[in-house]
Regions:
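Short glycine-rich, Thr/Ser-proximal phosphate-binding strand/loop in the N-terminal lobe
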Residues: 105-115
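Nucleotide/phosphate-binding catalytic cleft detector across ATP-hydrolyzing
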Residues: 1-93, 98-100, 110
């Protein structure tokens, strides 16, 4: 079995619900949860994602899966889903040769390449 490490990650986060005593922003809750999950590099959350946070977090009961993409310098949050979908993380590996193109489906969590 061949394995490969991708440039994206999906992580399930069970965030604490805001209270009068804990008034951290939604963004701060996510960044702290990512750090607790082992993401030590900088994470950028684009404005288009920030606009989706509160309605989605509230509907999801503060249990979400975030998708991160590595841009060569830092992680970028590219998607947010309700619940735990972290196991559903697939990608394509593409080899562009001089005469052929080979494409393989891979499980981005395990790195397993499906032949």
């Amino acid at each position: 079995m061949n394995t490969m490490r991708g440039l994206s990650r999906k992580l399930y986060l069970d965030l604490s619900v805001p209270t009068e005593e804990d008034q951290r922003s939604d963004q701060q809750r996510i960044l702290e949860a990512l750090s607790a999950e082992g993401v030590k590099e900088e994470v950028h959350i684009p404005v288009r994602m920030l606009r989706q946070l509160y309605p989605l977090l509230d509907r999801a009961g503060w249990k979400i899966t975030v998708s991160l993409s590595w841009n060569g310098e830092k992680w970028e949050l590219v998607d947010i889903e309700s619940g735990d979908t972290a196991r559903q993380h697939y990608g394509l590996a593409v080899d562009l040769g001089s005469t052929t193109v080979v494409v393989r489906l891979l499980d981005c969590n395990s790195g397993e390449i499906w032949e």
